[in-house]
Each structure stands twice: as structure tokens, then as C-alpha cells.
């Protein structure tokens, strides 16, 4: 398939372009079955080449690198300096002041005592500091996961009627969430979390934020009896049903005053990044001031609900409380899988965001192992599911964090709080915790992101709104299910209905582009050029064949109507076709036979190495003929247009 071709000139002046040497489309050297399998496995599970640092090292060095891979702290601790510690100390103290009041509030979302929220900001951050690869992420309970755990566990066991078994179910869910997370990382299946699209996450988080805020109306208004459901209709019905006698005006004044204070401090922090510490310490200041006034004026005697007693002391061992059998065992696995997935998605997204801002890399699979390990250990030390908190991580970042030591500092402060300070929270009003949670979750509602999604991709926006509406009108778990289903539906739609376009030639060039994108791109008389923007698999092969056949029919009808030359060649531009399977080849064979019956020749242009190798292996190249496979669309058009011109004369 060599020689020269003389493409016709594009200007009609009679001048001829210089001869162009036609290049043959080559198949790559055969690699062999084992090599192919090895290549696929490496690209799927080891695309980041995790073993590259082990090459050429002594056994002792390999052992050290292996330990360092599991515990990254060993690597960066050798280069740790006093300057870095100063930054980590300031950041750790700052996020500790934020996490303590948040943890007490988030524990209520999970329907557990406040101490368990504090426990979950002690052990998990210590584990993560040794095993995690993110320098900026701050670990602890978060609002969405706390609500998810509380909602799912409450549907199985009533926390008021059977608090002991409820707590055991929470620990069981935490254990299996950790197993699920660590298992994904160990098996290098981290890519699975990418199936939950960004749009679906935006919608789910926004819906969860509104649901959480509505749940806080119980403490914010001083309502004693409140619905266990999370949908907006049930919550608002419960709120207004108690409006006449169930609301407490002192509680409302406390909540509204401090919510205003918290929102003002957040506004100040956004306007001036140097004042990042103002919104960070505002929750703790709010707790201190409100607790002081409730104690002085004994507002609890006037109906203001308070936290009451919080046990002193650090985390007790809880491994004996995990259900490893019985009727709640499978429920623990189910809840742990769901909550673990959400926690993992949030943490990895946060870690990637701040890593990109500081221009360093994180290992997603190591992150999953670290997060999973800390939750497994946490379940054995009276913690519930912890993950990366966006609000704390943002404060951590702005405070000048250098390494994960900030998590250690935060954990130490929380431990000291558990040992010595928890009795002081006895008179903390529930309204202030509600105000803190409301101010925190408002940041999860990303209206700008939703507007951007609408502008870019309407199908993505459907996923976003489906998850959002599912959460606020039905339940958190249904909203998550909708998010996953729509994300998968979009993937299936893109796979089964790939984009296919007609190409035309741009004026005064040898460049061929989409005629819809470039209206001045002219189609060549007698030639139809089609580009398939996807791999051709069993799932879309029939669609590709039928779409190409439909275009041929439409072009034939147009040619007949306008007196243009009939289609004699169909060129398929295959450079975007990264792969093809047996069904794909079979569909092209059927298209070839169908076109031959209409006296139309099928031409392939620029098939990639994987595709051309399979075309040779299937004997399709012999069927279509090597002379009908070209390196470029330009080469194919040059030959085909000459033949069309000859047929016309």
C-alpha cells in the first residue's frame, strides 16, 4: 500500500499540489497474551506505578520503603523542622477550637451522646496522621455522615428505647465502613468512587445540608417532641404543629442571636483571609458565652434545653460491643457500606482539592487505607465514622498547616478537653449547638456550582437536582440512591449512544472538522465522512452501524434532491476509536456489506494500534482490503475524490 497520490487542488485554478506519499497503516508488533493481560492490569490497578521506588534497592531499603508506604509519616518526619511545627501548632489549635463544639453537635445528629463526637476527633486523627498522605485534611465527624448514620441506624433500632443496641449498631457500622474503605484501597479499586459524579455529589450535599439545617429546628426552637423523619414535609409539619405551645422564646433568642453572630464572623473571614481565625474560634466563643449566661440566669429552669452531663475521660475500648453475628450484623454491613462510601467520597475530594492548591500529589488508594484503618480502630475505641471535614480542612489550610501534625495537635487538645473540661459543657444550650451546625452546613449548599453545571451539561444538572430533591423530599438514603442511579445512567447513555458526527473540509486547508461546529466546513461531493467519538463495543455497535446507515440514506436523498453526485464512498474517521471488540467488528462488517449492495465503498481512516491489530486478527482487513484503510482523512479524500470525478466523466 505504497505509492504517490495527486490530490485535487482546493482552489479550482488548475494548479496541482505536489505528489503526496501515501503512508501505510501499520499494526503494532504482537505483544502476546500474557503481556496484554499484564498491561491491562497495570493500567487499571497500578497506573501510578507504586513499586517504581523499589527498583534497584537493597532488601533493607525495600523493607524501609514498604513500611514508609504504609506509614508516610516516617518519610516526612526526617525533614520536619521547628518552623513547620509552628505552623502545625497554630493550625491544630485553631481547628481544635472549631471541632469541639461541632463534634458535640454532630453527635446529636448521629443520635449518640456528645462524648462520642469528641471521641471521634481523638483516635481517628492520630491514626490518619501516621498513615495519610494529605497535609491539609482535618479529620473528625462531619454533618452529612453523622446524619446518614443517625438516620439509617434509627430506622433499625430506636435510640431512645434501646440505646445500648443502637450504640452497638453504630460501632458495627463504623467497623464495616472502615473495612469497606480499606478494602477498596488495598485492592486498588479507588476508581470506583469516581462513578459518583461531581454533579450528583453537589446535589446530594446540598440536599443533605438543608435536611440537617431543618433537623436543627428542634433545638433552635426548643421543641421537645419532634418527628424522626428527615423529609421536608414531615419536618415542617412537626415544626408548625408545635408552634402554639412547643416553641420556647428564650431558646429562640439564644439561637437567633448566636446564629447571626456566627454568620457575621463567616462573612468577615471570607472578606479578609487574614482574619480566618475569626470564624474558626467563633463557635467556641459562642459556646462559652451562652453556657455562662444560661448558668448565671439558670435559663434551663425556664425551658431552655441544655446538653447536661458529658462523661470525663478518653475513649473506652468498645471492640466487645461490635455485632459480629446476630440480626444486626447484616444491617451494620449495609449501613457501614453506604456511610463509608459517602465519607470516602468527601474525604478524597477534599484531599485532592487542597493537594491541587499546594501542588503536591496524594495517593488515592493510600488515603482509602488510612481512612479505613482509622475507622476500624475507631470502632474499637468508641468512635463513630470519621472522615475529612471541609470546613475544618479549609481553616487548617488558611491557618498555615504544614503537615498532618496539626491533626495530632487537635487530637491532644480534644483529649485534654475530655479529661478535664467536659463538665463545663453541662449548661451549654442545645440552641447554640443547632446554630453552630446550621452555620456550618450552609457552606455545603453550592449554588454557584449548580448554576455552572446547568450551563455546561443538562444531564449532569438532572443528576444534581435528582439527588437534591430526593434527599429533601424523601430521605437521605433515597437521595444517595438517586445520585448513584443517575450517575450510572449517564455513563450507560454515553457508552451506548456515543457522539457521531459528519466532517467537512475547512476552506483553503486539508483539515476536516465537524460541520455543526464549523458551518463553513464543506462536505466533499460523493463522499460522506463520519467520525465516531468513542470506542466501539457490544453496547453501542448496533447504534454506530444504524447511525451511519441513516446518514447515508439522508445524504443520498439530499444528493438526489439537489442534483449532487450520489454517495460513492463512506469514510469513517477512527482516530477517536480507542478500542473495538468482536461485536464492534461484526457491526462494521455488516455496514460494509450493506454499503456494497448500494455500490458504496467503505473506507477507514487512521485506526489506532489496538483497533488495527484487532482488525488484522479478525481478517477484516482482508475483507475490506488494505487499499481501503488510510492513515489520514486527507489521504482517503484525495483518492476517493479522484475516483468520484472519474466516474462523473
UniProtKB/Swiss-Prot annotation:
Organism: Arabidopsis thaliana
Protein name, per record: Sulfate transporter 1.1
GO CC, one annotated term: membrane
Membrane topology according to the record: Multi-pass membrane protein
UniProt-annotated stretches for the region Disordered: 1-20
Subunit structure as annotated in this protein's UniProt entry: Interacts with OASA1 through its STAS domain.
Domain STAS positions: 517-640
The encoding gene: SULTR1;1
InterPro entries, per the entry: S04_transporter_CS (IPR018045), SLC26A/SulP_dom (IPR011547), SLC26A/SulP_fam (IPR001902), STAS_dom (IPR002645), STAS_dom_sf (IPR036513)
Domain of life of the native organism: Eukaryota
Record has Ligase as a keyword: no
Gene induction: In roots by sulfate starvation or after selenate treatment.
GO molecular function annotation: secondary active sulfate transmembrane transporter activity; sulfate transmembrane transporter activity; symporter activity
Amino acid at each position: 500500500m505504497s505509492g504517490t497520490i495527486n490530490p485535487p487542488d482546493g482552489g479550482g485554478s488548475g494548479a496541482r499540489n505536489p505528489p503526496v506519499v501515501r503512508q501505510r497503516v501499520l499494526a503494532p508488533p504482537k505483544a502476546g497474551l500474557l503481556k496484554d493481560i499484564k498491561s491491562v492490569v497495570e493500567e487499571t490497578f497500578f497506573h501510578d506505578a507504586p513499586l517504581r521506588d523499589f527498583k534497584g534497592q537493597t532488601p533493607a531499603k525495600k523493607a524501609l520503603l514498604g513500611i514508609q508506604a504504609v506509614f508516610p509519616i516516617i518519610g516526612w518526619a526526617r525533614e520536619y523542622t521547628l518552623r513547620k511545627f509552628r505552623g502545625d501548632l497554630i493550625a491544630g489549635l485553631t481547628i481544635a477550637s472549631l471541632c469541639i463544639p461541632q463534634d458535640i453537635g454532630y453527635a446529636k445528629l448521629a443520635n449518640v451522646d456528645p462524648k462520642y463526637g469528641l471521641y471521634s476527633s481523638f483516635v481517628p486523627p492520630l491514626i490518619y496522621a501516621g498513615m495519610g498522605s494529605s497535609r491539609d485534611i482535618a479529620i473528625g465527624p462531619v454533618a452529612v455522615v453523622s446524619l446518614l448514620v443517625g438516620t439509617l441506624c434509627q430506622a433499625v433500632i430506636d435510640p431512645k428505647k434501646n440505646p445500648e443496641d443502637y450504640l452497638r449498631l453504630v460501632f458495627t457500622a463504623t467497623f464495616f465502613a472502615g473495612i469497606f474503605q480499606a478494602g477498596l484501597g488495598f485492592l486498588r479499586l479507588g476508581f470506583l468512587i469516581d462513578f459518583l459524579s461531581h454533579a450528583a455529589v453537589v446535589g446530594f450535599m446540598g440536599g443533605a445540608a438543608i435536611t440537617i439545617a431543618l433537623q436543627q429546628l428542634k433545638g433552635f426552637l426548643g421543641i421537645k417532641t419532634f418527628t424522626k423523619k428527615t423529609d421536608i414535609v414531615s419536618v415542617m409539619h412537626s415544626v408548625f404543629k408545635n408552634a402554639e405551645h412547643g416553641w420556647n422564646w428564650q431558646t429562640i433568642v439564644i439561637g437567633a442571636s448566636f446564629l447571626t453572630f456566627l454568620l457575621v464572623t463567616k462573612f468577615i473571614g471570607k472578606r479578609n483571609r487574614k482574619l480566618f481565625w475569626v470564624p474558626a474560634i467563633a463557635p467556641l466563643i459562642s459556646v462559652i458565652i451562652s453556657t455562662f449566661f444560661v448558668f448565671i440566669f439558670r435559663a434551663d429552669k425556664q425551658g431552655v434545653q441544655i446538653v447536661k452531663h458529658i462523661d470525663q475521660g478518653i475513649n473506652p475500648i468498645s471492640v466487645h460491643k461490635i455485632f459480629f453475628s446476630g440480626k444486626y450484623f447484616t444491617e451494620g454491613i449495609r449501613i457501614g457500606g453506604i456511610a463509608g462510601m459517602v465519607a470516602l467520597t468527601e474525604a478524597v475530594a477534599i484531599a485532592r482539592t487542597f493537594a491541587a492548591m499546594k501542588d503536591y500529589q496524594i495517593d488515592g488508594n493510600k488515603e482509602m487505607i488510612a481512612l479505613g484503618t482509622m475507622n476500624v480502630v475507631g470502632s474499637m475505641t468508641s468512635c463513630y465514622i470519621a472522615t475529612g471535614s471541609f470546613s475544618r480542612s479549609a481553616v487548617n489550610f488558611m491557618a498555615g498547616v504544614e503537615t498532618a501534625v496539626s491533626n495530632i495537635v487537635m487530637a491532644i487538645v480534644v483529649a485534654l478537653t475530655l479529661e478535664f473540661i467536659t463538665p463545663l459543657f453541662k449548661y451549654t444550650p442545645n440552641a447554640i449547638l443547632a446554630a453552630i451546625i446550621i452555620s456550618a452546613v450552609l457552606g455545603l449548599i453550592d449554588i454557584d456550582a449548580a448554576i455552572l453545571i446547568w450551563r455546561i451539561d443538562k444531564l449532569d444538572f438532572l443528576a444534581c437536582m435528582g439527588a437534591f430533591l430526593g434527599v429533601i423530599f424523601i430521605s437521605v438514603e433515597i437521595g444517595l440512591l438517586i445520585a448513584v442511579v443517575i450517575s450510572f445512567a449517564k455513563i450507560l447513555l454515553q457508552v451506548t449512544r456515543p457522539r457521531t458526527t459528519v466532517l467537512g473540509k475547512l476552506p483553503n486547508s486539508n483539515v476536516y472538522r465537524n460541520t455543526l461546529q464549523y458551518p463553513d466546513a464543506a462536505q466533499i461531493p460523493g463522499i460522506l465522512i463520519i467520525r465516531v467519538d468513542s470506542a466501539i463495543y457490544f453496547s453501542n455497535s448496533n447504534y454506530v452501524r444504524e447511525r451511519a446507515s441513516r446518514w447515508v440514506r439522508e445524504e443520498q436523498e439530499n444528493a438526489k434532491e439537489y442534483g449532487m453526485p450520489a454517495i460513492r464512498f463512506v469514510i469513517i474517521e477512527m482516530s477517536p476509536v480507542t478500542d473495538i471488540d468482536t461485536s464492534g467488528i461484526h457491526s462494521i462488517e455488516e455496514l460494509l456489506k450493506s454499503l456494497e449492495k448500494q455500490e458504496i465503498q467503505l473506507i477507514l481512516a487512521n485506526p489506532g494500534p489496538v483497533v488495527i491489530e484487532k482488525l488484522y486478527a479478525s481478517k477484516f482487513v482482508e475483507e475490506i482490503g488494505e487499499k481501503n484503510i488510510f492513515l489520514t482523512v486527507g489521504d482517503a479524500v484525495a483518492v476517493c475524490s479522484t475516483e468520484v470525478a472519474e466516474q462523473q466523466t
